[in-house]
């Protein structure tokens, strides 16, 4: 009789173990990737504080505007130029229309100043912001119209001019994305960046320029090394340069199929963009794309692509809006499909669990009856 009891007890535990295992197999899900919670935590905290960072920027803008309006008539044209340049810098990655307004103001003020350096500076800023808004032809026309006198212009003005002009051609190549014109635009962009090296003294910027040239020549390993050197020497308060370096390192790692490293840099870039109230950026879109295509994290990808679309719309970047607009319905549609599958899976799991629970109860009753009979 003792043997019968032991046999039934063992049978009971085996049935319980099998059913419990099946239950957990049906209800548990694999995490998309190991550091999901870390990424989610960093991004969630930054996004929660996004409005606060934007308000800080608006407060700075109001302060500069108030300073400009105080005794404006008594200010020299050089002073007006500097204050308007400060406003331009605040807006150039925040609002296209406002940045364009202050760029045109700078050109007007520069025309009243007897110095070629001011006009080159102003037109360089105008060309840069036109490209940010997707007006590549107008940007090239504006920058091409500048008369460059290398013997008399300050080195920093010349460096900014050639770097900005080179970036316009590189951005145009990225926008065109074809085998004919893109290679031509990249070549011109590299020639302009190479010209800037003669006027640079800052080591971080030199590494950045050399890294950009290597990247456009498809020398990924060399480019990555140069960008990392630029990042090590970068002024961490220069949020614009920091974002460029981080997002480009992410892009390079993505090309090298180093997906986890790419995500790491995209997160760093996106958090930096949020904290600096940057609306004109590629980091959030890049992060969303990586999470969607390489980590199957559709929920996060949908959230971040929505953020990217809102930022691009706020800034007024036509070509960014178009690119993100092609991704948005894909991500959101996939999210809806997955939620539908999850609901169906939950219903199926519930039915399956109920059936196994009934089987377990019947098995227990049967074992108890047999033990009593035995």
Q: What annotation goes with each model-predicted range?
A:
Residues 13-28, 336-374:
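Alpha-helical transmembrane signal-anchor helices
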Residues 2-14, 19-339:
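A "functional boundary" signal
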């Amino acid at each position: 009789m003792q043997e019968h009891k032991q046999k039934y007890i063992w049978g009971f535990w085996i049935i319980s173990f099998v059913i419990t295992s099946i239950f957990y197999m049906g209800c548990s899900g694999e995490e998309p990737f190991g550091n999901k919670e870390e990424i989610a935590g960093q991004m969630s905290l930054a996004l929660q504080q996004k409005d606060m960072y934007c308000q800080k920027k608006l407060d700075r803008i109001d302060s500069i505007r108030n300073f400009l309006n105080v005794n404006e008539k008594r200010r020299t044209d050089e002073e007006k130029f500097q204050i308007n340049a400060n406003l331009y810098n605040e807006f150039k990655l925040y609002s296209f229309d406002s940045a364009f307004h202050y760029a045109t103001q700078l050109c007007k003020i520069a025309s009243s100043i007897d110095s070629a350096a001011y006009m080159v500076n102003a037109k360089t800023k105008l060309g840069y912001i036109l490209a940010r808004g997707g007006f590549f032809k107008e940007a090239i026309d504006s920058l091409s119209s500048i008369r460059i006198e290398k013997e008399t212009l300050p080195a920093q003005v010349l460096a900014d001019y050639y770097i900005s002009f080179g970036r316009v051609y590189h951005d145009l190549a990225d926008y065109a994305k074809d085998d004919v014109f893109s290679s031509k635009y990249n070549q011109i962009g590299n020639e302009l960046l190479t010209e800037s090296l003669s006027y640079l003294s800052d080591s971080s910027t030199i590494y950045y320029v050399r890294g950009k040239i290597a990247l456009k020549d498809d020398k990924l390993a060399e480019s990555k090394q140069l960008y990392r050197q630029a990042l090590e020497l970068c002024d961490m308060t220069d949020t614009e340069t920091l974002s460029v370096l981080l997002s480009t390192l992410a892009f390079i790692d993505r090309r090298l199929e180093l997906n986890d490293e790419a995500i790491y840099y995209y997160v760093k870039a996106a958090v930096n963009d949020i904290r600096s109230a940057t609306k004109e950026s590629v980091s959030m879109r890049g992060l969303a794309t990586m999470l969607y295509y390489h980590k199957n994290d559709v929920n996060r990808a949908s959230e971040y692509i929505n953020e990217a679309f809102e930022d691009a719309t706020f800034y007024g970047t036509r070509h960014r809006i178009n690119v993100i607009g092609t991704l948005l319905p894909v991500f959101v549609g996939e999210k809806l499909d997955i939620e539908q599958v999850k609901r169906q899976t939950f219903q199926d799991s519930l039915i399956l669990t109920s059936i196994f629970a009934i089987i377990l109860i019947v098995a227990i009753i049967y074992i108890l009856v047999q033990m009593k009979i035995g």
